[in-house]
Amino acid sequence: MMGSNYPEHGTKPRSAKYHKQQNHRVVRKQPPRPAVSDRHNIYITSKTDFKAQQRRCEELINSGAHEIFLHCMGFSVTRGLNIALRLVQNSDGALSYAINTSTVQLVDELHPLCDAEDITFRQRNNSALHIKILNNSLFDIAVPQPSQSQTQAQSLGQFRGKAKARQ
């Protein structure tokens, strides 16, 4: 009996009502709508190749982007964390990161198998992670060129003695 797949003792069997409802409907999960379609926002999925997603992030950073945002949900949260940590590790201290968590509401369509019923919708929550990767080496400090009036005021301010009246 060691290798058998019997349910554990004490588990409650599912009700027949729940089973019937699920057997008569097909669940179609709708993808979440991206909030922002910007080049610096990268949506991490489990279907895309890991190396391709990492390469895309590296290309954005190497092209001069000050910051990029990685968005991931559910199963792809660990993948997003791995990409962020690899980017920071490979940058030799040039990159830093900040992480925020959130909950995203998703909508599923329940399509009936028979034509007598209507399509129904079901809302559910999913955990999401938003990772901001900052490029520390690209913070440009712009030094403005002084205008003529500023240079004259500075030259007068450098004279420390008493002003003499000229005749």
Swiss-Prot record:
Stored PANTHER family: RIBONUCLEASE P PROTEIN SUBUNIT P20 (PTHR15314:SF1)
Alphabetized Pfam families for the sequence: Rpp20
Domain of life: Eukaryota
GO MF term set: ribonuclease P activity; ribonuclease P RNA binding
Listed Basic residues bias regions: 12-31
Transmembrane portions of the chain: none
Keywords from the UniProt entry: Cytoplasm, Nucleus, tRNA processing
The protein, known as: Ribonuclease P protein subunit p20
Role noted for this protein: Component of ribonuclease P, a protein complex that generates mature tRNA molecules by cleaving their 5'-ends. Also a component of RNase MRP complex, which cleaves pre-rRNA sequences.
GO biological process: rRNA processing; tRNA 5'-leader removal; tRNA processing
Assigned GO CC terms: cytoplasm; multimeric ribonuclease P complex; nucleolar ribonuclease P complex; nucleus; ribonuclease MRP complex
